[in-house]
Amino acid sequence: EYENFGSKNYSSATFRIVNIWRPTGKLQLRTSIWQEVNPSLNPLATIRRERVFRFLPNWRVSAKQSFEILFEFQNDVLRDNPFTDGNDDVLDEDLITTYLQWNYQPSEHITIQSRVQKSKRQSDGVFRNFDSNLVFLNLQVRW
């Protein structure tokens, strides 16, 4: 299985488009699309392709408070042979993530973040499908 391991090509390529639009001073809309091809993340597959679409509006309520809403769609494909039409896929999975985050910075050195996140994965791999809900509170103190 690993006899040709040393002769594999471990180069990677990333194609990324990011657009940031600020219709007002308090509202920012960030859209990004990227595709990454990286065979080195899984030594058993010849190639790994990741496609991501992310939409992240940010609303700055005041100098100390802001809200973020994220929608992200990610598609990962591990493929045995990159020169075929895609019938050799080892793994094909979709991950959809959304979150609402509140940021508060009462001083220059303290940041408080609170996030509610939902993720859903559909996969034909070992881990199959899952749904996750996450709520967290983060406190950062910087000197």
What do these predicted ranges mean?
Residues E1-W143:
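Gram-negative and organellar
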